Amino acid sequence: MRFIQHKAEALWFYRVVSMGYDRWINPLFWTAPMRDAALELGALDDPGLEVLDVGAGTGFTTSGIVARVAPERVTMLDQSPHQLARAARKPALRAVRKLRGDAEALPFADEAFDRYVSAGSIEYWPDPQRAIAEAFRVLRPGGRAVVVGPLRRSHPLARALSDAWMLFPAEDEYVAWMQRAGFVEIERRHVAPPWWRPGWDAYGIAIAGRKLRSGPPALAAAPPREAASERLGPVRLGRFALGSLAGAAFIPVALWFTARERLRRWGRRR
């Protein structure tokens, strides 16, 4: 299934979503505290670091990066021109380099960056192992990669909807992809928005690894299987519609629990 786990379909998905991404999506599903907790794993402790943000979208994660690193040393990469156009309007990101590109075939030389960050992009990658191998390739020895993404659901309905939408990997899959690419010193932490309830499955993961050696990834990567430029015909258009509907089902859930949490806080203040 995973109707949006395809580059062309994801491109169309974000053509629509980009119009309200910062206003409606991030406040529900990818908040500033989540972002900051994830970026802590990246050791962005030197303003002179060269940082690549893959699947950067409208620049929400990039905004957290440039709070720690000089903007002119940061590169945003995304396949969606609509998302990047939104990012270009943000004053804090004016000096950031912005490129269209493919996470599975990064348009950079080997060992070009000190840090690699990708948040909320892996779920759209047809071949996550290839993309993480590319992260290893473009990092210099001693560099760190941070990948943030959703985790597999155990509830039957939530799992059916998420699997119809896009990729929700298991935690051990994230670890295996990092290790197979050659990353060591793996660190991970769970991240979740305020409305996510204790006792539920872990919402998402931030996982980081370090590249110790020079050279190619430990696991040779196959060529990309598809491109965002592939034609979106009737079958793919149907998949796009079904996947979008499955993803939209999560929005009222998030809104409901967000409202409950705010009412609870308001009641405590009275």
Language-model segments: residues:
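Conserved class I S-adenosyl-L-methionine
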Residues: M1-L44, F60-G64, Q83-R86, G243-G267
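Short, glycine-/aromatic-enriched active-site segment of Class I SAM-dependent methyltransferases
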Residues: P150-M166
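Class I SAM-dependent methyltransferase SAM/SAH-binding core
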Residues: E50-A105
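Conserved beta-strand signature within the Rossmann-like core of class I S-adenosyl-L-methionine
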Residues: G143-G149
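Short alpha-helix
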Residues: L167-G182
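A short glycine-rich, Lys/Arg-flanked "PGG" loop and its adjoining helix->strand segment in the class I
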Residues: Q129-P141
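A short acidic, Gly/Pro-enriched loop at the edge of an enzyme's catalytic core
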Residues: E104-R115
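Core SAM-dependent methyltransferase catalytic element
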Residues: P194-G233, W266-R270
